[in-house]
Amino acid sequence: QHYSLEWKPG
């Protein structure tokens, strides 16, 4: 699984 470190909830 890969998740962006730039992820921002919204």
Swiss-Prot record:
Molecular functions (GO terms): hormone activity
Residues with the Pyrrolidone carboxylic acid modification: Q1
Domain of life: Eukaryota
Family: Belongs to the GnRH family.
InterPro entries reported for this sequence: GnRH (IPR002012)
Organism this protein belongs to: Petromyzon marinus
The keyword Metal-binding is annotated on this UniProt entry: no
Task performed by this protein: Stimulates the secretion of gonadotropins; it stimulates the secretion of both luteinizing and follicle-stimulating hormones.
Residues found modified as Glycine amide: G10
Protein name per the record: Gonadoliberin-1
Keyword Secreted among record annotations: yes
CC annotations in GO: extracellular region
Keyword tags: Amidation, Hormone, Pyrrolidone carboxylic acid, Secreted
Intracellular or extracellular location(s): Secreted
